[in-house]
Amino acid sequence: MDPPFNEIYNNLLYNQITKKDNDVSEIPFSFSVTAVVEEVELPVIDVSRLIDGAEEEREKCKEAIARASREWGFFQVINHGISMDVLEKMRQEQIRVFREPFDKKSKSEKFSAGSYRWGTPSATSIRQLSWSEAFHVPMTDISDNKDFTTLSSTMEKFASESEALAYMLAEVLAEKSGQNSSFFKENCVRNTCYLRMNRYPPCPKPSEVYGLMPHTDSDFLTILYQDQVGGLQLIKDNRWIAVKPNPKALIINIGDLFQAWSNGMYKSVEHRVMTNPKVERFSTAYFMCPSYDAVIECSSDRPAYRNFSFREFRQQVQEDVKKFGFKVGLPRFLNHVY
């Protein structure tokens, strides 16, 4: 069932021990497996107020969303419009898919070629290894799937409802940052948005390996449905904190593109997933991305970042991961004119 994580771990360990020249790129300071961190509950926002509330309640809700995006880069939403029945079915279907043998998963015909991923192909050291597996599924794979299985119908329901929630939140954030809220309907299309189903198997070396390496998301915003195992951590006030699972909430986090588009008003925060020695963890995420040719440009007369297309951003991230083993991200696009 599991990918050959131990084999990869042992190969990386052997390479580190026998390597005579230290040419492994240094990873930023936050890339270290730490001991105990404080567990906190993210801000919780009842987004039903955006639809059903009076004008004053809607404005309070919008401000709460913007404030959490400025101060945390992460928040939770309840009464979000995605039923617990859909979420539970999504989890059950996900578990069933990951229970298949590794060889079958890696050659799966359920999704397009290359959808199944595991570990960190670019890893040159143990600290760059992610002890997890995933199915990376473009929205078009879901909507174009004519094989009406329980999996495809459940994914379509989850994806379409996540998409609606993402548009609603993005338009609120655009309004509160003085940007054009119609940008998302015009530019965030199904062929670049995607779902990612994640599984984090039990790891025998939890003090040495991440479930998912520290990173920021290369999108506008992410909607995450996770189980109650825990393991998600993020940076707040220059320290790592653990996110306390909330069974009634979805987690929302700001991506790199929103940080650049809002001129740094909203924060794309570094986060990671820790491993667990005994219990597996499951999550499903929806990533809101623009078309590849969409230009990320803020309306400020003193932009912190230069204009760039989503295609250019992706290519730069891929080049950095290949060269260094980790993503550099937005610092590559800082505007040095000011």
Swiss-Prot record:
Q: Does the keyword rRNA-binding apply?
A: no
Which residues are involved in binding 2-oxoglutarate?
281
User: What keywords are annotated for this sequence in UniProt?
Assistant: Dioxygenase, Iron, Metal-binding, Oxidoreductase
What are its GO cellular component terms? cytoplasm; nucleus
GO term, biological process aspect, one: gibberellin biosynthetic process
Q: Identify the pathway.
A: Plant hormone biosynthesis; gibberellin biosynthesis
Positions of disulphide bridges:
none
Kindly report, in one word, the top-level EC class recorded for this enzyme: oxidoreductase
The catalytic activity, as recorded, is:
gibberellin A1 + 2-oxoglutarate + O2 = gibberellin A8 + succinate + CO2
Offer an example of a GO molecular function term for this protein: metal ion binding
Q: Explain the induction of this protein.
A: Up-regulated by auxin. Down-regulated by paclobutrazol.
Active site, per annotation:
281
Establish whether keyword NAD is in the entry: no
Give the family this protein belongs to, as stated in its UniProt record. Answer: Belongs to the iron/ascorbate-dependent oxidoreductase family. GA2OX subfamily.
Name used for this protein in its record: Gibberellin 2-beta-dioxygenase 8
- The species this protein belongs to is Arabidopsis thaliana (Mouse-ear cress)
